[in-house]
């Protein structure tokens, strides 16, 4: 294979985008020539550009115009002509007709894939990180249908994800590969560096005997930020006499309406000194490496990177069943899996771990071991390169 075209939806610091970044680094190490098309920018853009050329999809000149202006332009066919010119310019810049293989990262990227008119002979690999909720939020049915119809091989991050695309979208299971890319050596190094940094909670004024229950992820309903606060209320209420007060820290909540709503709940629940919302930061591991328990409150998460980060920090995970692929890794020895949205059960398991330090250590260490056993980075990249070679030879 000579040239690989990668398509991503943006460069925000989130799970799928970080996986793509790690993938690009490993592919570059294999000498693969790449170009990346992004639907939008973000904090990771410079890191992407350090690996390969990056093209941001251009916006229409009149995209910010008033609705009436757009309607008039549409009737005159101006926008349609602009779109055609833009598509052709992007195709020429990417030299689409000479690309050997296309890798589409996330179904959201199907929007830009559909505008490129990729030649029928070019194999397409789609790396899916989304389940039902995210598919409905971040993709359109016709764009997803087109993407899946052109997909030669589907990379699914978990069994739950593979099952969803097979049974809800009729994708051929013989063309689905279970694939999770975690750059475990780099992540282990980053964890080590984070642990060597000064205790960030001391600078926040936490008591030295505090136990930290952590959450991490974007601020959105799907991630269960609201459930995290309810969980904190239950745990604190059931553990009033503890000599080790539990503090709840969620990393990844930016300023905005949702943050304001969450802070209102926190204040009204009397938890202002126990629940702490941290904005998105590249220093996630400084917080996570000192968590005592990680709770995945997501209503849906296919196979989130944060669970791998927690595991390599030797932090046990408590998550919901039927909310994605995390139970496949956590199982019965890396933490606890509780019934979907059962916060009573989740709070009981969290308290169990907080009260039993040896159990915390045993489960956290075992979770880290399973990650290293099941997801070695070298094997993962070799699997992908072999797949690329097979598809480009057909």
What are these regions (language model features)?
Residues 280, 299:
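Aromatic "clamp/platform" in nucleotide-sugar-dependent glycosyltransferases that forms part
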Residues 56-57, 149-167, 171-195:
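Donor nucleotide-sugar binding/catalytic pocket of nucleotide-sugar-dependent glycosyltransferases
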Residues 37-43, 183, 216, 245-261:
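Glycosyltransferase donor-sugar binding loop
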Residues 316-320:
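Short hydrophobic beta-strand element within catalytic cores of glycosyltransferases
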Residues 260-279:
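Nucleotide-activated donor-binding/catalytic signature segment of Leloir-type glycosyltransferases, i.e.
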Residues 345, 352, 359-374, 380-386:
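A short, well-ordered alpha-helix in the C-terminal region of glycosyltransferases
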Residues 17-22, 211, 215-237, 260, ...:
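A conserved mid-protein helix/loop that constitutes part of the nucleotide-sugar donor-binding site
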Residues 104-110, 128:
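Short His-centered aromatic/hydrophobic patch
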